[in-house]
Amino acid sequence: MKPPISIQASEFDSSDEEPVDEEQTPIQISWLPLSRVNCSQFLGLCALPGCKFKDVRRNIQKDTEELKSYGIQDVFVFCTRGELSKYRVPNLLDLYQQYGIVTHHHPIPDGGTPDIGSCWEIMEELATCLKNNRKTLIHCYGGLGRSCLAACLLLYLSDSISPQQAIDSLRDVRGSGAIQTIKQYNYLHEFRDKLAAYLSSRDSLSRSVSR
């Protein structure tokens, strides 16, 4: 696949300038089965495509072409724009769109958690993608903290799954580093109560406005 015409070669490091890109390993996508929550789909998780930081030197166009070849239709990005610049992929969101991948950008600070309203928006968008059988991928920087938290929350929406079962499911596919901070761990455990309170207050507000 040729790179989109509107993307200038100078915006991305070319493989001619960095021969190491020729030898890079394929982007590693972990596929989380959602059968435990009565969904036949799999949710993809990965680290930041195209990342150039410290000893990581990936080629953004190759990674994006790989995602396209996997059939990815929707991607959820949890990196902030500051992170995208830091890791030298400032135009990643535009590139996804130019390759025909629907992009959902929900920035969450590294190691942090979303506010409950933003979290519910993410859950609704994820559920819609999966319900419509769209091949969906989520990523942050390392694909272990924020992405794994979002995937855990999606599982935990099911009454049949405990927080630890959700974490174990993610660690089965992403390794022991999944869910990286105490803040994320606590957020998961408190999620159902906070979500119930949020939805209740939202419904109350809606009723008062409609009167």
UniProtKB/Swiss-Prot annotation:
Keywords: Cell cycle, Cytoplasm, Hydrolase, Protein phosphatase. Pfam families: CDKN3. SMART domains: PTPc_motif (SM00404). The keyword Cytoplasm applies. Its EC number is 3.1.3.16, 3.1.3.48. Residues 1-20 are annotated as: Disordered. It is found in: Cytoplasm, Perinuclear region. Belongs to the protein-tyrosine phosphatase family. PANTHER family: TYROSINE SPECIFIC PROTEIN PHOSPHATASE AND DUAL SPECIFICITY PROTEIN PHOSPHATASE (PTHR23339). Interacts with cyclin-dependent kinases such as CDK1, CDK2 and CDK3. Does not interact with CDK4. Interacts (via C-terminus) with phosphorylated CDK2 (via C-terminal helix). Interacts with MS4A3 (via C-terminus); the interaction enhances CDKN3 enzymatic activity. GO terms for cellular component: cytosol; perinuclear region of cytoplasm. It catalyses: O-phospho-L-tyrosyl-[protein] + H2O = L-tyrosyl-[protein] + phosphate; O-phospho-L-seryl-[protein] + H2O = L-seryl-[protein] + phosphate; O-phospho-L-threonyl-[protein] + H2O = L-threonyl-[protein] + phosphate. InterPro entries: CDK_inhib_3 (IPR008425), CDKN3 (IPR022778), Prot-tyrosine_phosphatase-like (IPR029021), PTP (IPR050561), Tyr_Pase_cat (IPR003595), Tyr_Pase_dom (IPR000387), TYR_PHOSPHATASE_DUAL_dom (IPR020422). Residues 32-200 form the Tyrosine-protein phosphatase domain. GO terms for biological process: DNA damage response; regulation of cell cycle. May play a role in cell cycle regulation. Dual specificity phosphatase active toward substrates containing either phosphotyrosine or phosphoserine residues. Dephosphorylates CDK2 at 'Thr-160' in a cyclin-dependent manner. This is Cyclin-dependent kinase inhibitor 3.
